[in-house]
C-alpha cells in the first residue's frame, strides 16, 4: 500500500466540551493518507483552574503521537515546577520527558501496545514477567519505573511526532510547540501566530543541525525529516557529547506566554494538514464566517477539514491527516498585551513570537 488511499476516509472523530472558563470543539480525519497518525488531547480540568489542549502529528507511524496524547499532560501536571506555579518550565521538561519515557523496556512495551503490536492483555503479562526493579520508582516523581527485559537497551523510537499544546490557567495562556503544528489566536479578527513552524532551513535550526553533525538536503534533516524539532526521532538524538536541546533534532519547545483579554475571539491548534492548505489569516477568516451561523465548535472544525480536503492526490496539499481544536473563552478580561500580527507576512515566513522558558 502506498501513502495514499484510492478514496479518502472522510469519517471524522469530533468532540465538544466546556467548563466555566472556556468551551472547545475538535475534529480529526484520516483523509487520503493510508493510516491515521494524528492524535490529540483535550483536558478541560487539568486542575481546578487549568485546561490543557494539544495536537500531535505523527510521522513514521502513530505510536509517538498517541504516546504524547496519553502522557504529556500528565507530565506537566506532575512536575514540581508546575506545583510551584511555573507552567512554562513544566511544559519544557514534559517535552523532553517524553523522549526519556519512550526508552528502555517500559518505553518499548508502551509503544508496542499503542502500535497494536501487542494487545493490552499481552502488555500486562509482559509487564509481570519484566517487572520494575524494586525501589527504582521511588526516585521518579511520576513513578515511571525502570523495567528489566529483552528491550532494556531500547534507545527509543525512530518514528516521531510534533507537539503543539496550549495551557489555559486563569487569565494566562501558555503555548508550547515543537515541530510544524501551529497555534493561532484571533484577536479583533486578526490572526496572530503563537508558535513558530520548526523547519530545517530556519537559520537557528540550521546552525544547531550542522553543529551537531547533521546536514540539510532538499529542506530535510539528513535528507529525510522535514522538521527540525520533534518528540521521538531518536536516530537524530544519539550524540552522547551534546545535551538534548543541541541534538540534530530536539524536542525542545518554544514556550510563549500570552495574557488573555476581551479582544480574543478564539484560539486554534491544528496540524500541518490544515496549515498546508490555508494561511493563519485565511483560517481565522473562514472560522469567523462559520461562527455567524454555527454555534457548535466541532461542526466548525469539521467544515474546515472538508474545506481543506483535496479532490484528488495529484497536488499533495489537502491529502494529509487533519486535526483541529477550536477554543472560545468565557468572561475574558481587558489586557494591555500587544501581539505582533504574523498572518500578514508572506506565507511560511513567521517570526518567532516572544517566548519564556
From Swiss-Prot:
Residues 331-357 are annotated as: Disordered. Its EC number is 3.1.3.16. Mn(2+) 1 binds at residues 57-58. It catalyses: O-phospho-L-seryl-[protein] + H2O = L-seryl-[protein] + phosphate; O-phospho-L-threonyl-[protein] + H2O = L-threonyl-[protein] + phosphate. Keywords: Hydrolase, Magnesium, Manganese, Metal-binding, Protein phosphatase. Its cofactor is Mg(2+); Mn(2+). GO terms for molecular function: metal ion binding; protein serine/threonine phosphatase activity. This is Probable protein phosphatase 2C 60. It comes from Arabidopsis thaliana (Mouse-ear cress).
